[in-house]
Swiss-Prot record:
Biased segments, Basic and acidic residues type: 227-238
Family, per entry: Belongs to the universal ribosomal protein uL1 family.
Main function: Binds directly to 23S rRNA. The L1 stalk is quite mobile in the ribosome, and is involved in E site tRNA release.
CDD domains: Ribosomal_L1
GO function term, MF aspect, one: rRNA binding
Assembly mode: Part of the 50S ribosomal subunit.
GO biological process, one term: translation
Record bears the keyword Ribosomal protein: yes
Record-given protein name: Large ribosomal subunit protein uL1
Positions of the UniProt region annotated as Disordered: 219-238
Pfam families in the cross-refs: Ribosomal_L1
InterPro entries per UniProt: Ribosom_uL1_bac-type, Ribosomal_uL1, Ribosomal_uL1-like, Ribosomal_uL1/biogenesis, Ribosomal_uL1_3-a/b-sand, Ribosomal_uL1_CS
Length: 238
């Protein structure tokens, strides 16, 4: 196990790891226990009661965070002609087809999301092994394979995030920055949680949301009551 810094250990002392905090309490505590001098990112980890090895229990989706992530995502678009012009006008950070694929094959990965028009997907498939493991492969289910590149770019730049369960049945997503006020963090958390609950596979048995933790990138994970799905802005446990 990696050795923890003194700042991390001091922050961890403020947390009762045997307690399940309300989302609002966790948001406040995450900000208090951040050991970063920068504007730290606030993250959520969720353990689900699914078996990702089964195709019918793969949980994935998208959510438009009402207050964004605090970061303007870098978006690339695979498109040509008129659609390429639309993507550039919408604010895409890089637009292209073969040239963009070659850059990525050469090791360039300085972007947060990738969009493709349907006619470009056969070409983009050549770099699926590069993009897929990083969660960057365009997919119709997440709205990133589309002819409406203007909307897709605007959605992602505006705070749309993707979530996908990993092999250990965990989901990880961002809900904002430490500079956000507590209510905005909680409202972003609630929006994401609602989508995750809607994405519950019909074949999943038993408890669906098994564990939730909130933390900053460098801070300790704060255990959150997974049963708190309503009245999230209430401070008291209930």
């Amino acid at each position: 196990m990696a050795k923890r810094s003194k700042a991390y250990l001091a922050a961890a002392e403020k947390i009762d790891f045997d307690k399940l905090y309300s989302p609002l309490q966790a948001a406040k505590l995450a900000k208090e226990t951040s050991s970063s001098k920068m504007d730290a990112t606030v993250e959520v980890a969720v353990r689900l009661g699914v078996d990702p090895r089964k195709a019918d229990q793969m949980v994935r989706g998208t959510v438009n965070l009402p207050h964004g992530t605090g970061k303007t995502a870098r978006v690339i678009v695979f498109a040509v002609g008129e659609k390429a012009a639309e993507a550039e006008a919408a604010g895409a950070d890089a637009v292209g087809a073969e040239d963009l694929i070659e850059r990525i094959q050469g090791g360039w990965l300085d972007f947060d999301a990738a969009i493709a028009t349907p006619d470009q997907m056969a070409k983009v498939g050549r770099i699926a092994r590069v993009l897929g493991p990083r969660g960057l492969m365009p997919n119709p289910k997440t709205g990133t394979v589309t002819a409406d590149v203007t909307k897709a770019v605007a959605d992602i730049k505006g705070g749309k995030i993707n979530f996908r369960v990993d092999k250990q049945a965990n989901l990880h997503f961002v809900i904002g920055k430490a500079s956000f006020d507590d209510a905005k963090l909680v409202e972003n958390y609630g929006a994401a949680l609602d989508e995750i609950l809607r994405a519950k596979p019909s074949s999943a048995k038993g408890r669906y949301v098994k564990k939730v933790t909130v933390s900053t990138t460098t801070g300790p994970g704060i255990p959150v009551d997974p049963n708190r799905t309503r009245n999230l802005l209430e401070d008291a446990d209930a």
